[in-house]
C-alpha cells in the first residue's frame, strides 16, 4: 500500500508519559482505564501543578531511533497528532508544551497537530493514512474512518507493522 501520511501520537509512543507522571509529579500513574475517577483526577491535578509537564518528558525507550528511521524514509509524510487534556482539567499550556517538545527533540519542521482525543479520527484521508497510537480506542476509531492503524507496543513491532503495510 502507498503510505500517504504517518501520524505519530506523542504520549506513550514518543514521550514517556507514565515515567513523567512518576518522576515529575511524584505519583504512580493510573492505568489508561482507571477504576477510580478520584485516582484519575488526582493524576491530572498533579500534572496541572507541574510546570511545563509535557515539555519535560523523556523519550520512550527506543522511540527516538524509531522516529528517526521512519522520518528519514518519509520526511514529507510524517506528522505529530497528539491529544491534549480536556479543558476542564485546566492544563492550558499542554499544546504549547507538546509543540515545544517536538521542536526541541524531533524536528523544527515536522507539523504538530494538537487536538482533543476524539478529534484524531478527523485526520483520516484514506487507507494510506497511518496512525501510530498506544490507545486501542483511537486505533479502532481511525480504522472505522478508513485509515490504517498501528497499535503501539514497541518500536520494533511498529517498524515491523509499517513494513507489512508497505508491502
Show where each model-derived region lies.
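Acidic, Mg2+-coordinating phosphoryl-transfer loop and its flanking beta/alpha structural elements
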Residues: 130-162
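Structural recognition of alpha->loop->beta junctions
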Residues: 98-113
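Conserved Lys-Pro-Asp/Glu-containing loop-to-beta segment of HAD-superfamily phosphomonoesterases
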Residues: 113-140
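Short amphipathic alpha-helix with an adjacent loop that forms part of the alpha/beta core around
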Residues: 122-125, 161-167
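Active-site neighborhood of HAD-like aspartate-dependent phosphohydrolases
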Residues: 1-48, 144, 154
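Substrate-recognition element of Asp-dependent hydrolases with the DxDx(T/V) motif
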Residues: 57-58, 63-95, 102
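Short, solvent-exposed loop/turn segments at secondary-structure junctions
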Residues: 13-15, 20-21, 84-88, 118-121, ...
Amino acid at each position: 500500500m502507498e503510505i500517504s501520511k504517518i501520524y505519530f501520537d506523542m504520549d506513550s509512543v514518543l514521550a514517556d508519559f507514565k515515567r513523567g507522571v512518576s518522576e515529575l509529579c511524584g505519583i504512580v500513574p493510573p492505568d489508561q482505564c482507571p477504576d477510580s475517577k478520584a485516582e484519575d483526577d488526582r493524576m491530572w491535578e498533579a500534572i496541572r501543578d507541574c510546570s511545563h509537564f509535557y515539555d519535560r518528558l523523556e523519550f520512550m525507550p527506543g522511540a527516538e531511533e524509531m522516529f528517526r528511521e521512519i522520518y528519514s524514509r518519509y520526511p514529507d509524510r510524517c506528522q505529530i497528532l497528539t491529544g491534549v487534556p480536556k479543558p476542564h482539567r485546566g492544563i492550558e499550556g499542554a499544546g504549547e508544551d507538546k509543540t515545544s517538545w517536538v521542536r526541541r527533540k524531533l524536528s523544527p519542521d515536522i507539523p504538530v497537530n494538537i487536538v482533543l482525543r476524539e478529534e484524531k479520527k478527523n485526520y483520516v484521508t484514506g487507507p494510506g493514512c497511518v496512525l501510530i497510537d498506544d490507545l486501542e480506542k483511537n486505533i479502532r476509531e481511525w480504522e472505522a474512518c478508513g485509515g490504517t492503524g498501528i497499535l503501539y507496543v514497541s518500536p520494533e513491532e511498529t517498524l515491523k507493522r509499517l513494513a507489512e503495510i508497505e508491502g
